[in-house]
Curated annotation (Swiss-Prot):
<comment type="subunit">
    <text>Part of the 50S ribosomal subunit.</text>
</comment>
<dbReference type="GO" id="GO:0006412">
    <property type="term" value="P:translation"/>
</dbReference>
<dbReference type="GO" id="GO:0017148">
    <property type="term" value="P:negative regulation of translation"/>
</dbReference>
<dbReference type="GO" id="GO:0003735">
    <property type="term" value="F:structural constituent of ribosome"/>
</dbReference>
<dbReference type="InterPro" id="IPR005822">
    <property type="entry name" value="Ribosomal_uL13"/>
</dbReference>
<comment type="similarity">
    <text>Belongs to the universal ribosomal protein uL13 family.</text>
</comment>
<dbReference type="GO" id="GO:0003729">
    <property type="term" value="F:mRNA binding"/>
</dbReference>
<comment type="function">
    <text>This protein is one of the early assembly proteins of the 50S ribosomal subunit, although it is not seen to bind rRNA by itself. It is important during the early stages of 50S assembly.</text>
</comment>
<dbReference type="GO" id="GO:0022625">
    <property type="term" value="C:cytosolic large ribosomal subunit"/>
</dbReference>
<dbReference type="InterPro" id="IPR005823">
    <property type="entry name" value="Ribosomal_uL13_bac-type"/>
</dbReference>
<dbReference type="InterPro" id="IPR036899">
    <property type="entry name" value="Ribosomal_uL13_sf"/>
</dbReference>
<dbReference type="Pfam" id="PF00572">
    <property type="entry name" value="Ribosomal_L13"/>
</dbReference>
<keyword id="KW-0689">Ribosomal protein</keyword>
<keyword id="KW-0687">Ribonucleoprotein</keyword>
<protein>
    <recommendedName>
        <fullName>Large ribosomal subunit protein uL13</fullName>
    </recommendedName>
</protein>
Length: 148
């Protein structure tokens, strides 16, 4: 009888991928990135172990918001104080902090536990014109448009 394969944290090979977000819909980009961060694209995927890879997203300010999401979709956060609810439209968030828009979208597709937070730390987002600091890792290009 065969036993089920369980990945061990010290045996995991992690790769680096770079993704260009130019003219890619936000949700489709986020779902592919979340899949790679979790490690579900690998045959060694184990749900209780962080088997995912590192992902670098460039040109975050050029991501596409389809439909009326730029004016209708609202992101909320609360300061913890009475009356501290803050709201920001997706279009405004893309203009002022495009990194946060992609990070929030990907984080919403990861598990809501300690493992999901650890997987979210492997995401690095850069707007256009910013210097990518992970070039020493020699990231492989992951073409989202071919996967869609």
């Amino acid at each position: 009888m065969r036993s089920t394969f369980l990945a061990k944290p010290h045996e995991i090979q992690r790769n680096w991928y770079i993704v260009d977000a130019t003219d890619v819909p936000l949700g489709r980009l986020s779902s592919v990135v979340a899949t790679v961060l979790r490690g579900k694209n690998k045959p060694t995927f184990t749900p209780s172990v962080d088997t995912g890879d590192f992902v670098i997203v460039i040109n975050a300010d050029k991501v596409q918001l389809t439909g009326k999401k730029a004016t209708d979709k609202t992101y909320y956060h609360h300061s913890g104080y009475p009356g501290g609810l803050k709201a920001r439209k997706a279009g405004t968030l893309r203009e002022k902090n495009p990194k946060k828009l992609i990070e929030l979208s990907v984080q919403g597709m990861l598990p809501k536990n300690t493992l999901g937070r650890a997987q979210g730390l492997k995401l690095h987002v850069y707007a256009s014109g910013e210097e990518v600091g992970q070039s020493a890792q020699k990231p492989q290009v992951l073409n989202i448009k071919d996967l869609l």
